[in-house]
A protein has these predicted regions:
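Conserved, structured core segments of small domains
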Residues: 1-92
Length: 92
């Protein structure tokens, strides 16, 4: 299944800079792992916001949930998920 995942980082502005840097590095590393595993297909930034839009592939919603919760910043992410269905024009 493919999923469109929108996430906005809600890390507090006064969060310690050193810890913020650690989380960002961990987030980058985990995203690379998810990409290598074929779970994270595409990732875009949203201009003007601390937000991303990603195309993920997982066997089911539970597997996607596990992948998203494995992100180091997951406690501070505001996430919305839309399951995607193939459009008839894409089936040819």
């Amino acid at each position: 299944m493919e999923f469109l995942v929108r996430s906005e980082n809600r890390l507090p502005a006064d969060f310690p800079a050193e810890r913020r840097a650690e989380l960002r590095a961990g987030e980058r590393a985990r995203a690379t792992e998810l990409r290598s595993a074929g779970v994270l297909k595409r990732l875009w930034r949203v201009p003007g916001r601390n937000a991303t839009v990603g195309l993920y592939e997982a066997a089911d919603p539970a597997e996607l949930h596990d992948a998203l919760m494995s992100l180091p910043m997951s406690p501070w992410l505001d996430v919305s998920v839309e399951a995607l269905a193939t459009h008839p024009q894409e089936r040819t």
